[in-house]
Amino acid sequence: MVSHRAARRKRASATDLYRTCKQSGTCPPDVVDKVEGTTLADKILQWTSLGIFLGGLGIGTGTGTGGRTGYIPLGGRPNTVVDVSPARPPVVIEPVGPSEPSIVQLVEDSSVITSGTPVPTFTGTSGFEITSSSTTTPAVLDITPSSGSVQITSTSYTNPAFTDPSLIEVPQTGETSGNIFVSTPTSGTHGYEEIPMEVFATHGTGTEPISSTPTPGISRVAGPRLYSRAHQQVRVSNFDFVTHPSSFVTFDNPAFEPVDTTLTYEAADIAPDPDFLDIVRLHRPALTSRKGTVRFSRLGKKATMVTRRGTQIGAQVHYYHDISSIAPAESIELQPLVHAEPSDASDALFDIYADVDNNTYLDTAFNNTRDSGTTYNTGSLPSVASSASTKYANTTIPFSTSWNMPVNTGPDIALPSTTPQLPLVPSGPIDTTYAITIQGSNYYLLPLLYFFLKKRKRIPYFFSDGYVAV
């Protein structure tokens, strides 16, 4: 019987093994050295390359590539043509010493060029002849102006390199004619033309913003948020917290201590006040009004815990001291100037309330009665008023008596009188019988007030002379 041997399974490549086993740390040493290039051969090449330059030869432990130019066949080296570019001549640099001038001439010096005209030659050996004479006639100059025209030309140039910028000269004008040069005068009275200035494209009221994004009119600054849940509220009853806040944190007593700035301290194990333990910073004070008091507040930060890095961790505490209370506003009770007295009970007996649709009926009736010219001698007759109730309001209208009486609206208010009144004493027994006297002429009933449109009540309400019918 022939035994079959199991086929040997091929091992994975070093690169595949390195990818899978590097993260777990179970790679064989030969795989790690081969992939990372730390084998003995690689180390020998690294040490040798420190003294011998082997660059470009392709020597290594990896796959051979033949270097930069590749492998050369054994038959021989192929012919190569090398292109040689023409060499540029070097530029000669001439150094300039410190004593030599630094002015470089743009045009080189050239020789004298002759125009071809012959140069005159002087003959003779006697030299120059000098003649002297004497004249006794004085020299007289004729200053009479000639009859011809005089032409004067003037040209002015302005060179900014030689002109003082602080001096301003008036520009001059020149002429090349027969007239004498006249410059612009700088003093005296001159004639000028007054041209009024005009404004173009005017629109608006002049209060429009001059920028595309105007600044808002009111900008409010948010106050400190001292009453949030992140701040611990601590009340300080000692008034020294306003003037000397450091006396609550440290035992030092400085000569000068600013009270309107932020104060910084070092964390101490013991504080004069237990509420200020571990305080490292007290912010600047703030004055607020809360619940009717003026409150002085400071926000403090504690350094309860300090990490190794130096970070300070602690709570924020709001210390406050109530300086004074704000008095409530005074409330002044207003008193009525006129006291309305209740009307007499007898006036209520003569009030008649009627439901009408229009006040025109009443106005027509009373105007006709008031315009009558009949007068009566009645002595002291009472003035009876009637209140007519409409759909919209109640109107009080006084009835007309025997004389002409104007119609007044509104309630009657009896003003207080200072005249003393004697008490009324009855002269005899009270009689329950009443005598009603109707005084007037013939009368007639108005049909407009006798019959109503909505409520047909055939009841006469009053007579034409203004007295109540009984």
Curated annotation (Swiss-Prot):
GO terms for molecular function: DNA binding; structural molecule activity. Coiled coil: none annotated. Disulfide bonds join C21-C27. Its main location: virion. It is found in: Virion; Host nucleus; Host early endosome; Host Golgi apparatus. It holds the Pfam family Late_protein_L2. It comes from the Viruses. Keywords: Capsid protein, Cytoplasmic inwards viral transport, Disulfide bond, DNA-binding, Host endosome, Host Golgi apparatus, Host nucleus, Host-virus interaction, Late protein, Microtubular inwards viral transport, Phosphoprotein, Viral penetration into host nucleus, Virion, Virus entry into host cell. Highly phosphorylated. GO terms for cellular component: host cell; host cell endosome; host cell Golgi apparatus; host cell nucleus; viral capsid. A motif (Nuclear localization signal) lies at residues 1-12, 451-459. GO terms for biological process: microtubule-dependent intracellular transport of viral material towards nucleus; symbiont entry into host cell; viral penetration into host nucleus. InterPro entries: Late_L2. Interacts with major capsid protein L1. Interacts with E2; this interaction inhibits E2 transcriptional activity but not the DNA replication function E2. Interacts with host GADD45GIP1. Interacts with host HSPA8; this interaction is required for L2 nuclear translocation. Interacts with host importins KPNB2 and KPNB3. Forms a complex with importin alpha2-beta1 heterodimers via interaction with the importin alpha2 adapter. Interacts with host DYNLT1; this interaction is essential for virus intracellular transport during entry. Belongs to the papillomaviridae L2 protein family. HAMAP family: PPV_L2. Minor protein of the capsid that localizes along the inner surface of the virion, within the central cavities beneath the L1 pentamers. Plays a role in capsid stabilization through interaction with the major capsid protein L1. Once the virion enters the host cell, L2 escorts the genomic DNA into the nucleus by promoting escape from the endosomal compartments and traffic through the host Golgi network. This is Minor capsid protein L2. It comes from Human papillomavirus 39.
